[in-house]
Amino acid sequence: MAMRVLLVDDSVMVRDIVRNHVECMGGSVVAEAENTMQALDLFRTVNPDLVILDVAVSQTGGIGALALFRIMRSEVPEMPVLVISGLALPDLRRSFIREGALDYLFKPFTPRTFEQLRNLLVERFPELAHPMIQVRNAAPIARLATAG
């Protein structure tokens, strides 16, 4: 069964890039949200295996995303949440990691970022390590990720 992902990011371009990468690995983005309210509604209805959450989905500099993260973790404590951000805020990163985020990856994405993402997901979802499920031609996706 494919890994079911809820993708939360206010940028359509970033959602496209991340969705393409998840699908190349054999996963499925089952829902996308561009703000915290949409994300919480979808989280409660689509039952994802993983949430990929951008810190900047609210105008509060990450505080709204952290509050959303805490609500999700209180409702489903074992839910893996991967945080992505263009904000280099070490204290916020530490807060997410301390509270149980799978990891906190920085944008813009590079080929190395996608390799980190793949390794994290394979660790959490071993079925993604199957030899037939490979990151197919990630270079064009990585080029798109740094365009802008």
What are these language model-derived features?
Residues 46-57:
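Active-site beta3 strand of CheY-like receiver
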Residues 63, 67, 88-105:
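Alpha4 helix (beta4-alpha4-beta5 surface) of REC/receiver domains from two-component response regulators
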Residues 91, 109-121:
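C-terminal output helix
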